[in-house]
């Protein structure tokens, strides 16, 4: 009997070993003892081969980061002037945020909203008290937060405002950027985001950003069916476009007058980026809904949130909206630490003062190169340089960013003639100065050579006319 048992065990161990399974099914990969690729060039080649081509990155590979400093695999140091589109306001790998992550990851990472966990309720209370709203609906990405706000506005419109079934309208702004999901790009004027992705979703109207008169005209004509007005207090992807003074107050008054929800997308502009906790604070207005994201996760984990009062939020019932990972304990712990850093390190004040320093430096450069620089604009550390397309062509803003990269500064273009400058709010004055000096050297030393080299090339075509509304957005 014992011999039979041993033979059976031997057969099972062989039959169901890794080698046995491989012989039977032929599906398991062979062990690879080689080290993973480490050179920047090879890593970029691998990404190009195996990843979808939905981004056009500046060719630099991040290997390590701390504060405002990035290192590539070869050890070259760079100053970060993008901060992951403002997701790293607190600085890369902030020790307090990393500690919160490490402590929580050893206890509990996910419960789903099918059950309670011991972190999200504390985070929910903290966030709502901090921003003065009754309730929060947690999600993960900024686009999810916007989608959540849109659904909530439609639901409120049908149930509270008595908009007829399936007739709720959301008004948004030309030049807006709220994400790339289907409902969101249905509002977009970005032809790259809309062409080939139809049919786009109905129920959207557009208005010029910063034009309160045009907004009131739409409200007068269709206000009985308009549920919400979605806007960025400062348009980021459009090139850090700041509305005229008084615009946000006028929007608040119009939304109240016509019973329309005022929905502020503060995913990029919020959490101290503009020199205020929220960009809406520049005009001391309170939207009906605020969407937060990016820096809410401290550059560590995706966290987004929609804030609203109960008379809006409670129109969502169980089963009508949710997310498996939204409000997870790991994200909640990280988000609370991220908020602590903003408050304790006075990042609102740092953003305001350092932003003033940066714009002084950039305007000095503008005076030296008026032929090339059309405008310097921004609030806090949310800034952009717009170049003169005629004098820059056929060189593009992307080419400027490539030259900046060679000089140790990482920035990203938006559209063909704008470079956005949004460093971590923890950046030092010396690093700001280094970044400005690098830009000066690019314009003085590199740009003349770039113009000479590219003199015979056809300028990069950048269509600025929206397919849908016909507006010339970035001319």
Swiss-Prot record:
One Pfam family it belongs to: Aminotran_3
Cysteines joined through disulfide linkages: none
Lineage top rank: taxon: Eukaryota
Modified residues (N6-(pyridoxal phosphate)lysine): 294
Cofactor: pyridoxal 5'-phosphate
Positions that bind pyridoxal 5'-phosphate: 142-143, 177, 265-268, 324
GO cellular component: mitochondrial matrix; mitochondrion; plastid
EC numbers for this chain: 2.6.1.13
Catalysed reactions listed for this entry: a 2-oxocarboxylate + L-ornithine = L-glutamate 5-semialdehyde + an L-alpha-amino acid
Primary localization class, coarse: mitochondrion
Pathway: Amino-acid biosynthesis; L-proline biosynthesis; L-glutamate 5-semialdehyde from L-ornithine: step 1/1
Gene Ontology process terms (BP): arginine catabolic process to glutamate; defense response to bacterium; hyperosmotic salinity response; mitochondrion localization; ornithine catabolic process; plant-type hypersensitive response; proline biosynthetic process; response to salt stress
Chain residue ranges for the region called Disordered: 23-43
Subcellular location: Mitochondrion matrix
Disruption outcome: Unable to use arginine or ornithine as nitrogen source. Displays sensitivity against type II non-host pathogen infection.
Quaternary structure and interacting proteins, as annotated: Homotetramer.
Record-linked PANTHER family: AMINOTRANSFERASE CLASS III, ORNITHINE AMINOTRANSFERASE, MITOCHONDRIAL
Name of protein: Ornithine aminotransferase, mitochondrial
Source organism (scientific name): Arabidopsis thaliana (Mouse-ear cress)
